[in-house]
Regions:
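Membrane-proximal helix-loop-helix interfaces that form the catalytic/acceptor-binding platform
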Residues: 2-6, 13-329, 377-534
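Membrane-interfacial, low-structure loops and terminal tails that flank and connect transmembrane helices
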Residues: 1-14, 327-372
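Serine-biased, low-complexity intrinsically disordered segments, primarily in secretory-pathway proteins
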Residues: 536, 541-550
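Intrinsically disordered, low-complexity regions enriched for glutamine and histidine
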Residues: 68, 82, 143, 179, ...
Length: 554
């Protein structure tokens, strides 16, 4: 009889684990697919789209001078976009990456505490607006988060299993994730602190050291190449307390209000959750803190580079909620149920951090002996997460609007298709905004790219090589109207770019042309310039010369 009872308890526990892991993944899958086609890509997504559609030799050639840090992702997207080159397909890997991360966060909660903690943690991760944002981004960050969550789960298995093969699985997963984005290397510091808090034996440290060595060996060539391309992150600024505050708000299920403070309180309560706190707290705090600290010397910080650290927040909040539910169950013991989702050994969720104990069949068979608040507590937690999601619905709707991204190249292209006449010349200022025409070539099929000398795929560059300043000036002398797709900030400020060809573009349109039509989409402005009358052009040229001389003296 005892054997049959244990068998039934084990089967119920397995079913509870499956439910806890599957439900959050399905939830974020639905959220991610909702409004996935926004009707236009923004700049970074267009880079993914264009590079992914090149041949493998062309991608390899490009990576020698640009975006080596994203090389593995571009090769992956080359395979994906071969199925169908479209905006929805471009973003689908991120949707599935977010779903995988939610399931893996739930699996961590199940492994470290019990199924309902995993269910709550996975759901909290799924409904956090930041998760939904990057689930709909045609970039690598959602996949990176999935890789880090998988590596963290493999770390626990390696610690508990004590086999050499498990450490190679852990090191391999983390190495591949580092190739998706090199900032993942900071996870090694978080995992090292986790092992220290768990007080693991020397053999575990040796296994982890070998795995970390594998990660370093794989990552070193990428770091060396990316150092040569460090100018790509020259736009980043030194982060301050305001960026840290924004990150805290983004890592919680709601950025402000009652839900925010309740979530923070539960996370604080979760700090006493034993093994889970030893895993979640270093993951949540250490990578962002290290990157912000390094960025005080050399700016490298951006929120998306540490998106993977978000997984620690729902784990702590779910563990805190579990401890609160257990306390309520002790006050009203008659409400304690027998749902496997709510069962678990109290020593797993409430003990101080200590040595990791193997997680096996015996824990499942004896779990029903622990204190539980049962199905009612589990469903109450699920309902609370659902209410938090409802409160965040305005944020989700806003995030799915085309105007919420830095720009909408699709909208700019639609305006170009409507307004450009056959044979009209077009300038891109700076040249990287040629991405607009390359991403939506049909919209610019009537236009003449007056500055382009050699295409991007042929030259091994992203947006091609442009003609010389003198040749461009001669070409522009023969046109009476020219369209400009330019960076809004450059056009507003009038500051001369560093590149000579870019300076000629700006100088000629300011001296010899007048802006007539204007369409702005975030960072991108689409303008029509028509040639000034002769007398006006002479006055404008004189004024421009004086202005340029003044700038040179200053």
């Amino acid at each position: 009889v005892l054997s049959e009872d244990a068998g039934r308890a084990n089967r119920r526990w397995v079913r509870a684990e499956i439910v806890a892991v599957t439900v959050p993944a399905v939830v974020i899958l639905v959220i991610g697919l909702w409004g996935l086609d926004r009707g236009g890509m923004w700049g970074d997504e267009s880079v993914t789209f264009l590079v992914g559609r090149r041949t493998v030799p062309q991608i390899w050639q490009l990576l020698h001078g640009l975006d080596a840090v994203h090389g593995l992702y571009y090769l992956f997207m080359h395979v994906v976009l071969a199925v169908h080159p479209g905006e929805v397909v471009l973003r689908l890997p991120s949707v599935f990456g977010a779903a995988a991360t939610a399931g893996l966060v739930a699996a961590l909660g199940v492994r470290l505490v019990r199924p309902r903690v995993g269910l709550w943690a996975g759901l909290l991760y799924a409904v956090t607006p930041l998760t939904g944002h990057y689930a709909q981004e045609g970039r690598s960050y959602a996949l990176v988060a999935a890789g880090v969550a998988a590596a963290t789960l493999l770390l626990l298995r390696a610690v508990e299993g004590r086999s050499r093969r498990a450490w190679w699985w852990y090191g391999g997963a983390l190495a591949v994730t580092c190739l998706l984005h090199e900032m993942v290397v900071l996870v090694l510091c978080a995992h090292a602190l986790t092992l220290a808090l768990m007080r693991v034996p020397r053999t575990v440290w040796l296994g982890w050291g070998r795995a970390a060595g594998l990660v370093g060996a794989v990552l070193l060539p990428l770091v060396w190449v990316s150092q040569e391309q460090s100018g790509q992150v020259g736009w980043l600024v030194t982060p301050g307390w305001d960026q840290a505050g924004l990150l805290v708000g983004d890592f919680v299920v709601a950025p402000d209000g009652v839900v925010f403070w309740v979530s923070v309180a539960l996370m604080v309560l979760g700090l006493w959750a034993g093994r889970l706190a030893a895993v979640a707290l270093p993951l949540l705090v250490l990578p962002p803190a290290l990157l912000i600290a390094v960025s005080q010397i050399r700016p490298l910080y951006h929120e998306r580079y540490v998106l993977y650290a978000l997984a620690g927040a729902p784990l702590l909040a779910a563990a805190g909620a579990d401890r609160l539910a257990a306390a309520v169950a002790h006050l009203w013991p008659k409400q304690a149920g027998q749902s496997p989702l709510g069962r678990g050994a109290v020593s797993m969720s409430g003990s101080a951090v200590g040595r990791v104990q193997p997680r096996g069949r015996r824990r499942r068979q004896t779990a029903h002996r622990g204190t539980s608040s049962g199905a009612l507590g589990t469903l109450t937690g699920v309902l609370a997460v659902a209410l938090a999601f409802v409160q965040c619905l305005p944020l989700y709707r806003q995030d799915r609007s085309p105007g919420h991204r830095p720009e909408n190249l699709g909208a700019v292209a639609a305006r170009a298709a409507r307004d450009i006449r056959p044979g009209d010349p077009v300038l891109f200022l700076p040249s990287n905004w040629r991405l607009t025409a390359l991403t939506y070539p049909k919209a610019f099929r009537k236009a003449r790219d007056i500055a382009l000398r050699e295409s991007g795929p042929r030259s091994g560059t992203l947006s091609g090589i442009e003609t010389t300043p003198g040749e461009l000036r001669r070409k522009l002398a023969g046109v009476d109207r020219v369209w400009v797709v330019g960076q809004s900030r450059v056009l507003r400020s009038g500051l001369l770019p560093a590149d000579p060809t870019e300076r000629v573009k700006l100088a000629v349109v300011e001296e010899q042309f007048i802006a007539r039509e204007r369409y702005v989409s975030g960072r991108v402005t689409f303008l029509l310039y028509v040639r000034r009358p002769a007398a006006s052009a002479a006055v404008a040229a004189s004024s421009a010369a004086v202005s340029s001389s003044s700038r040179d003296r200053s």
